[in-house]
UniProtKB/Swiss-Prot annotation:
It comes from the Bacteria. This is Gasdermin bGSDM. The lineage of its organism: Bacteria, Pseudomonadati, Pseudomonadota, Betaproteobacteria, Burkholderiales. It comes from Piscinibacter sakaiensis (Ideonella sakaiensis). It is found in: Cell inner membrane. The N-terminus has marked structural similarity to the mammalian gasdermin N-terminal domain. The C-terminal region wraps around the twisted beta sheet core, probably stabilizing the inactive state. Palmitoylation helps stabilize the inactive state; may self palmitoylate. Palmitoylation plays a significant role in pore formation. Its main location: membrane.
Length: 266
């Protein structure tokens, strides 16, 4: 599977509107800018851009800040099975690649929503990426053909989360009170994250190590007239942009969560 279809999900829509591509990265501790190859619907992480441009061509310090508009934005309501699948994937974003036990049977009869909290971003201005590329871009192992066809991209901004909140709701005919549960009897995160009951309807999962990015801003790398171009904005089709012909942030797949593969361990 190369992506998860989530076109109607409220959180994915918020991320897309902010210019972010939702992603599932293979590991934690990664920082932008990084090179990606998008080929036949598969997004593969190549490695750090710094290894493919001259030393000193990129700024020494990343910009960073909070993403208040994304923090606490909820997903659409999910069934119990869909909630289990989403939580299993979302835990990877806070460093839990596999949970020894993830039993959500206590939520039977409820609908579930999720949100990320403590959302921050780190990245560079797209203009800095373009300037570095034109000082000399040499991505070893990527063919001229892939560059010519626009398959090469750079993630210049990553969004991270401190925690994932899971909230339960019912139609009124049933009552859910997670404070009355021994939550450790249902969920075991293998010591890689903390599970805290925040209220009668909300459980929070907080990672202990470095988080994985759960979304990124991408731009496309192309060569034109002996110069490199870095396109972080695009003119999208009718119905997507507020004004016809307006430039919007570059998105690989609207309404989808992209599953990232690693090409190499750098």
């Amino acid at each position: 599977m190369t992506s998860l279809m989530c076109r109607d999900d409220a959180l994915v829509q918020v991320l897309n509107k902010a210019g972010y591509n939702p992603i599932l990265l293979p590991r934690t501790g990664l920082e932008p800018p990084e090179i990606y190859l998008y080929e036949q619907g598969v997004l593969r992480r190549w490695g750090r851009l710094a290894t493919a441009v001259p030393a000193g061509s990129l700024p020494d310090t990343l910009q960073e800040g909070e993403q208040a508009d994304i923090s606490h934005s909820e997903t659409s309501r999910k069934s119990l099975q869909a909630a289990g699948n989403f939580l299993n994937d979302a835990l990877r974003c806070i460093g839990v690649n596999s949970a020894p036990k993830l039993d959500l049977s206590f939520a039977r009869g409820a609908v579930v929503t999720f949100s990320f909290s403590g959302v921050t971003w780190r990245g560079l201005d797209p203009a800095d990426i373009g300037a570095a590329l034109n000082q000399g871009f040499d991505p070893a192992g990527l063919s001229e053909e892939k560059l010519r066809l626009g398959m090469v991209h750079v993630a210049y901004d990553y969004a991270y989360a401190d925690a994932i909140d899971m909230t339960l709701a019912t139609d009124g005919s049933a009552k859910v009170d997670v404070q009355a549960l021994n939550i450790n009897g249902f969920i075991d995160l293998g010591g890689k994250a903390e599970c805290e009951v925040k209220s009668s309807t909300t459980i929070s999962f907080k990672g202990k190590g470095k988080p994985a990015a759960f979304a990124c801003k991408l731009g496309q790398v192309k060569r034109a007239k002996n110069r490199w171009t870095f396109n972080a904005r695009e003119v999208v089709g009718q119905g997507f942009a507020p004004e016809e012909g307006a430039a919007e942030p570059y998105l690989l797949r609207r309404g989808q969560v992209l599953i990232v593969e690693d090409m190499q361990a750098t």
